[in-house]
């Protein structure tokens, strides 16, 4: 029975969502705090999208 408790605790830890991985960035303040820029429509060349800036079509872009 103790093995089941251990198994359930490991499953709980591994299946828990990680902060920052699934949530992403959703507002301009968080985007700027992460050293990124808000850009309309698409990210400029050599930038990677890491979230949105809250407005439809506005991307949060950061250099890799």
Curated annotation (Swiss-Prot):
InterPro entries, alphabetized: Beta/alpha-defensin_C, Defensin_beta-like
GO cellular component entries: extracellular space
Keywords carried by this UniProt record: Antibiotic, Antimicrobial, Defensin, Disulfide bond, Secreted, Signal
GO molecular function: CCR6 chemokine receptor binding; chemoattractant activity; phosphatidylinositol-4,5-bisphosphate binding
Start and end residues of each stretch annotated as Phosphatidylinositol 4,5-bisphosphate (PIP2) binding: 33-48
UniProt signal peptide: 1-23
Subcellular location: Secreted
Source superkingdom: Eukaryota
SMART domains in the record: DEFSN
Disulfide bonds: 31-60, 38-53, 43-61
One of the GO biological process terms: defense response to fungus
Function, in words: Exhibits antimicrobial activity against Gram-negative bacteria and Gram-positive bacteria, with highest activity against Gram-negative bacteria. Antimicrobial activity against P.aruginosa seems to be salt-sensitive and is reduced with high salt concentrations greater than 25 mM. Also exhibits antimicrobial activity against the yeast C.albicans. Permeabilizes C.albicans cell membranes via targeting plasma membrane lipid phosphatidylinositol 4,5-bisphosphate (PIP2), thereby leading to cell fragmentation and cell death. Acts as a ligand for C-C chemokine receptor CCR6.
The family this protein is said to belong to: Belongs to the beta-defensin family. LAP/TAP subfamily.
Subunit structure, interactors included: Monomer. Homodimer.
PANTHER family on file: BETA-DEFENSIN, DEFENSIN BETA 4A
Protein name: Defensin beta 4A
Organism: Macaca mulatta
Highest classification ranks of the organism: Eukaryota, Metazoa, Chordata, Craniata, Vertebrata
């Amino acid at each position: 029975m103790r093995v089941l408790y251990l198994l359930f605790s490991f499953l709980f830890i591994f299946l828990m969502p990680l902060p920052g991985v699934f949530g992403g960035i959703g507002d301009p303040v968080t985007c700027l705090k992460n050293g990124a820029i808000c850009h309309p429509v698409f990210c400029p060349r050599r930038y990677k999208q890491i979230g949105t800036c809250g407005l439809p079509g506005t991307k949060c872009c950061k250099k890799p």
